Amino acid sequence: MKKTPILFVCAAMMLTGCSGATATIKDKDETIMTIGDTKYTKGDEYDFLKISTGTDLTMELVKQAIYKQEVKVTKEMKKKAQEQVNNYKENMENFDEQIQSLGYKNSTQYMNKVLIPSLQASELTKKYFTDAKKDIQKTYKPSKARIIQCENKATAKKALKALKNGTDPEEVAQQYMVDSAKYSGKETLVTTKTTDLSTRLINTLSKTKKAGVIDEVFTNESSGTTYAYVAVLVSNTYKDIKDDVYTTLSSDDDVTKACLVYYLKKYNFEVHDQDVFNNLKANNPEYLVSRPDLSESDD
């Protein structure tokens, strides 16, 4: 697919002219209000809006451009959005008045400007887990495993021996797991976001080529106590666990941000307005994908 650059330039935000690297608007000197001897122009209003909401508005415009390329509006989306509107009207008093107070003419505009884009955002995230599978595997190292949390290494070694003898993990867990164990031999998805398991265990599960018992006892500290763990790899084949990976990670803030960055890179996102550039540089440098040096850690 040909990459179409997404540029935040003069066309965005209804800009009609550029002065150097800073966007301006047509008729910027036209007075829109006065108070005493002070007058405010269209240019004053635009500059204020750009400074106060410019970055948010920029990214919303960019998202819409990405949705247009990646997630078409379907009949099913329209149906879901209409059902949401109907539900709001049934359960909220003065729904139409409320959305009008937010600046929407009617429920149809609210549906098109808010609800449908929200559905598109969800679909884009789901698509990301297919499009960026290599990135996800590299970053989050997902695998599905059956893990048993034991009180100490000695107990874990006994559990490991039972697993190697072919005993079902849940049966082994009943005998050897610590009281109130989080990991009791049931299938669970493990990723780098799983903070109560050791990095070594996560990496081992991710790299192991064949499903089965991992012949090692792992330890990790949790709430001031060190526990021992044994594990059985179920699968680390991405296509087999993708749905679980999506369910587990899709609402994570880092993943949501990474999703947007992925598509910004795909469409060569650039910012040509200095004010917006500076704002993004200060708050979300990772979105300035044409300048990866800005998002690099100082460490």
What are these regions (language model features)?
Residues 12-20, 68, 126, 256:
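Short hydrophobic alpha-helical membrane-anchoring segments
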